[in-house]
Amino acid sequence: MMADTLEIVLITGMSGSGKSVALHALEDAGYYCVDNLPPELLAAFVALEHQHHGNRVAIAMDVRSATALPLVPQQLRRLRGEGVTVHSLFLDATTDTLVRRFSETRRRHPLSRDEWYGEPHALLETLELERELLADLREQSHVIDTSAIRAAQLQGYVKSLMPALPGQLTLVFQSFAFKRGVPVDADYVFDVRMLPNPHYEPGLRNLTGKDQPVVHYLEQAREVRQMREHITHFLGHWLEPLAQNHRSYVTVAIGCTGGQHRSVYLVEQLAAEFSDRWTTLRRHRELDGR
């Protein structure tokens, strides 16, 4: 049996979603990293690298290994049975975002080669095939939506996960603007657009839900207090069963119109409230992108 201090972070996801950026972030954090490892070599590689490179290893796999990807869940179960701590991250983005990134970089999608189709196919078709091939891995991983974040932000977020990785369930609270789309990595989504909006108060418009005048304004509203209480009750009831089901992460997304006031306020308050019992992380999609 391997030492129980061995920690593996597996990075998979859509082509163009930022897997290389995430891997570089882990390398900066002290992980020994390898890119595009064939899935059938995973267990042997982990055993070898544990002997030579210490207790923290990060591995990136992509759809170029698609024919062997069904082996990965079984390999991960085997490693966990040997006492290895395994975390699986899946990077994703909207199809429109991926198309734009491929257009900007002028790179060819790895599935566009003839051996997959017998003839060239359009980018949209290859992305659709890739989603189908990676669906099972996505279902078993912590999903990170990179659609609205830059490379430096993604690196920072992946690094922020590091202290939480060895623990049990981690709660990720994320604020967002509905006008920019619902985060694809959300496990639960709460719509708070019906709450009083500080945007229409001239003295609060340029502030955020972190600022005390906005906090004071929102806490005076009965419906804001009720919303917070209802979300707290829901999460308080279901987090323990989720943790017992071996979930490593739960992402709670809270959205308002602009992602600046109401959703930010609730993310800050809920993260503070649940931090006594769970490891919590905070993401403000629209604020972090400024």
From Swiss-Prot:
UniProt xrefs under Gene3D superfamilies: P-loop containing nucleotide triphosphate hydrolases
Species per Swiss-Prot/TrEMBL record: Paracidovorax citrulli (strain AAC00-1) (Acidovorax citrulli)
InterPro entries (alphabetical): P-loop_NTPase, RapZ-like, RapZ-like_N, RapZ_C
Binding annotation for ATP: 13-20
GO molecular function: ATP binding; GTP binding
Keyword line: ATP-binding, GTP-binding, Nucleotide-binding
Binding positions (GTP): 62-65
Keyword Oxidoreductase found: no
Function: Displays ATPase and GTPase activities.
Domain of life: Bacteria
The name this protein goes by in its record: Nucleotide-binding protein Aave_3603
Similarity remark: Belongs to the RapZ-like family.
One Pfam family it belongs to: PapZ_C
